Amino acid sequence: MAEKRNIFLVGPMGAGKSTIGRQLAQQLNMEFYDSDHEIEKRTGADVGWVFDVEGEEGFRDREEKVINELTEKQGIVLATGGGSVKSRETRNRLSARGVVVYLETTIEKQLARTQRDKKRPLLQVETPPREVLEALAGERNPLYEEIADVTIRTDDQSAKVVANQIIHMLESN
């Protein structure tokens, strides 16, 4: 890959966007960004706190601004928040400014990967996690599919294997 295109990872929580993104950036010698981490850096608070204080709408506004700013960069790998695709503006930006890779996974894998993680505000509710994840999948999966240039299933694969698949698919296009 001569020219370094931006690579934007989308998908549900627990799909491996951050882990795979770091691996991919390392293998391609590109800068890695995580939109949730960038929000935490700017606010000085974790995502859960921002959600609690500002609500989901306030969080999504911050997320949209961060993603807009990061997509202006060149040659980066960006792991987006699972709900970032709810914003049409964000979907349009991601599509226009890089290659969008949808990391797909099952509800079972999401449950296994997120069960002990207390930094998932949408799972810190009374509703059973499976019901929350199923509702989010129904709402968001069509949005991931809408903007995906490449879709890769991450269920039982290591970050390195998935990163290699992404690189191979990008080189083929």
Swiss-Prot record:
Binds 1 Mg(2+) ion per subunit. Its EC number is 2.7.1.71. InterPro entries: P-loop_NTPase, Shikimate/glucono_kinase, Shikimate_kinase/TSH1, Shikimate_kinase_CS. One of its GO terms (cellular component) is cytosol. One of its GO terms (biological process) is chorismate biosynthetic process. ATP binds at residues 14-19, 120, 157. NCBIfam families: PRK05057.1 (NF003456). This is Shikimate kinase 1. It comes from Enterobacter sp. (strain 638). The gene is aroK.
